[in-house]
Amino acid sequence: MFGHALLLGAFPFCIGIYGLITSRNTVRALMCLELIFNAVNVNFVTFPNYLDIQQIKGEILSVFVIAVAAAEAAIGSAIVLAIYRNRESIRIDQFNLLKW
């Protein structure tokens, strides 16, 4: 049963990594990053349940990661919207605005 839970976390993680590497669209890259965060949360909840039942550190860490992911999504969406207003494009390879 432990292996099934790890596969449940590893499968979306691999999909998110693949999507993050191959995507040209910024919104798709942000969605893949959120998928990676959710896969990590599944593993954070899975490990404490099989190692020690008395501790809830995995669940607390998972809630913290959800809060950080929500802030990352809000800031990332705001940056994408600001760049879209200036450049009229959301393609990753055309984002050279933040280089200078």
Curated annotation (Swiss-Prot):
Reaction(s) the record says it catalyses: a plastoquinone + NADH + (n+1) H(+)(in) = a plastoquinol + NAD(+) + n H(+)(out); a plastoquinone + NADPH + (n+1) H(+)(in) = a plastoquinol + NADP(+) + n H(+)(out)
GO molecular-function terms, A-Z: oxidoreductase activity, acting on NAD(P)H, quinone or similar compound as acceptor; quinone binding
UniProt keyword terms in alphabetical order: Chloroplast, Membrane, NAD, NADP, Plastid, Plastoquinone, Quinone, Thylakoid, Translocase, Transmembrane, Transmembrane helix, Transport
Main subcellular localisation: plastid
Membrane-topology annotation of the record: Multi-pass membrane protein
Top-level taxon: Eukaryota
Record field: transmembrane: 1-21, 29-49, 63-83
EC number(s) reported in the record: 7.1.1.-
Record InterPro entries: NADH_UbQ_OxRdtase_chain4L/K (IPR001133), NUOK/Mnh_C1-like (IPR039428)
Subcellular location: Plastid, Chloroplast thylakoid membrane
One of the GO BP terms on file: photosynthesis, light reaction
Gene Ontology CC: chloroplast thylakoid membrane; NADH dehydrogenase complex
Family: Belongs to the complex I subunit 4L family.
Role played: NDH shuttles electrons from NAD(P)H:plastoquinone, via FMN and iron-sulfur (Fe-S) centers, to quinones in the photosynthetic chain and possibly in a chloroplast respiratory chain. The immediate electron acceptor for the enzyme in this species is believed to be plastoquinone. Couples the redox reaction to proton translocation, and thus conserves the redox energy in a proton gradient.
Subunit structure: NDH is composed of at least 16 different subunits, 5 of which are encoded in the nucleus.
Protein name: NAD(P)H-quinone oxidoreductase subunit 4L, chloroplastic
Gene symbol of the encoding locus: ndhE
